[in-house]
Amino acid sequence: MDEYRQAIAPEAPRTLENTGALYVYNNYIFINEQKEGIHIVDNTDPENPTPIAFLKIPGNFNMGIRNNLLYADNFVDLVVMDISDPLDVKFAGRTENVFDSYQFYQDLGYLVYYEESEETVELSCSDLNFGNDFFWMNDGRLVFDAAFSNNAEALSPNVSFDQGGNSIGQAGSLARFSIIDKYLYSISEYDLRIFDLEDPVAAELASTVNIGWGIETIFPYQDNLFIGADHGMYIYDNSDPLNPTQLSLFTHARACDPVYVQGNTAYVTLRDGTECEGFDNQLDVVDITDLSNPKLLASHQMSNPHGLSIRDENLYLCDGRFGFKVYDVSDWRLISSRQLAHVPGFSAFDVITVNGKDLAIVIGEDGLYQFDISDPADPVRLSVLSTGSR
């Protein structure tokens, strides 16, 4: 791993290619280039967003920002970058061996890269590898189950200030990192890892909470954590930041599951897809007045819902290959019949409605789209940063 543990320095801007997590801080947008690093975009003028740098961080999928320090995964490490001057980002620190998303083999080291090819491998039910997500073959090839390989590390404001006076950025609903006060919360497929940022450039892994398999997203709201999984939504009491305790689990059919919370209502999107092994495409509206006993209020049929955001009484929804949609959610019974707007023609998987601005930032396979949402029924496209293949 030493070759990946070099000081990270900004490089010239790159073209977007394989976009992932989306993050907003001050007048800047941070876009994950899956497995490669982070694009920094000056968004002072949303009609003319300007890429200004690329941070090459191998193995990166996730990020969070607190007090001008960017925290990002770098394979099995957590790295810290000083972004006080986004044009001159400085490497600030590293905490080693705190993530286990990559398999370690005693004779070979960490598996961090592979070239993919499609092949059908038949196993008998008595084979020791039957039921495993991945395994090595005798000829040295590594075999992944198709569902597992499609579920690599994915994927709440412009700046807000928490009760401790810390400036925290704004993440999308597919986020797997979340910063609350002086703690960074990170989810893997099965646990929650809590980093103490008392020394902000030397983050300490302070606590690990086992949750269960299929964990996908984390959304903090007030003193609670709402954790989306492929089988439901976990609600945790986070009044003790190092020891979150489970209050409840709202279950649903197996499907991909981001969560957004406003007031006493949680909005959960379910979608089909290989990695989810499900066939539901819907928006669930859940009453969380009693956090220990969440109750389904309604399910609304959607096309292929992904990330979402709520502003006032409007739902901003990324509907996969069907584009970007806006719904009136003032009456939970009527959401599906109250579509206010539909912007087709591009793929959308996550959205941030920027705090204090009539601005929606949407990320997808086609690139980064920005919309003026001063009239929710008529979102106006301001700009596009397209991926290199589009």
PLM regions with names:
Residues 1-390:
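Feature marking well-ordered beta-strand scaffolds used for ligand recognition
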